[in-house]
């Protein structure tokens, strides 16, 4: 009987630690997604500004540089680590960055996982970075990443030979892509919120 009680106490303590860890990771994911929203909104504002017909090619190039900086910040946020050093969007306990940039293109190389935090209760402690950042409709029936959207905007706005029509088309495509990307991140945050509510019920 004493052994059974000790085992139950040990199991309860382990579950308590697992719940605490899962909560921390999910809160860090929520913070990262919130920062991503801010960065994408800032980029959207710049794209709108770049669409002003009175701007010169030099003005647009300057805006493109700002958008590029925001894009790089977004990549850093997407590779956020949790308190244990694992990547929040990188899969269960991953020590490998989930978002990898090669020759200017960003790819996602992770497999999100779940963790049991209570008897028969599992929550996602590694969020699906692909769904959040890499699955934006491209307007032609395919998918692209939010990084692709920003890269295309930077390229178009940096082109000194771009015509007014080119700029208009590029800014519209960027706004559409960023709006879709913001919706994806918002959905990811909703998922995190649901997981946190599940943890509240376990506690």
Q: Which residue stretches match the model-derived regions?
A:
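Amphipathic alpha-helical coiled-coil/heptad-repeat segments
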Residues: 44-150
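Amphipathic alpha-helical polymerization modules
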Residues: 1-94, 155-203
């Amino acid at each position: 009987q004493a052994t059974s009680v000790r085992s139950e106490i040990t199991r309860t303590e382990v579950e308590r630690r697992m719940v605490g860890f899962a909560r921390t990771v999910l809160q860090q994911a929520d913070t990262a997604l919130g920062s991503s929203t801010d960065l994408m909104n800032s980029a959207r504002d710049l794209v709108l500004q770049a669409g002003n017909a009175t701007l010169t090619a030099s003005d647009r190039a300057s805006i493109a540089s700002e958008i590029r900086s925001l894009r790089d910040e977004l990549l850093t946020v997407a590779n956020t680590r949790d308190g244990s050093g694992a990547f929040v969007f990188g899969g269960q306990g991953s020590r490998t960055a989930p978002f990898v940039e090669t020759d200017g293109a960003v790819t996602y190389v992770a497999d999100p996982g779940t963790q049991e935090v209570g008897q028969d209760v599992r929550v996602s402690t590694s969020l699906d970075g692909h769904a959040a950042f890499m699955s934006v409709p491209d307007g032609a029936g395919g998918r692209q990443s939010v990084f692709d959207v920003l890269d295309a905007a930077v390229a178009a706005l940096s082109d000194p030979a771009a015509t007014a029509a080119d700029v208009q088309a590029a800014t519209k495509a960027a706004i559409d892509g960023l709006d879709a990307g913001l919706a994806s991140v918002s959905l990811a945050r909703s998922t995190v919120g649901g997981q946190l509510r599940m943890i509240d019920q376990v506690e």
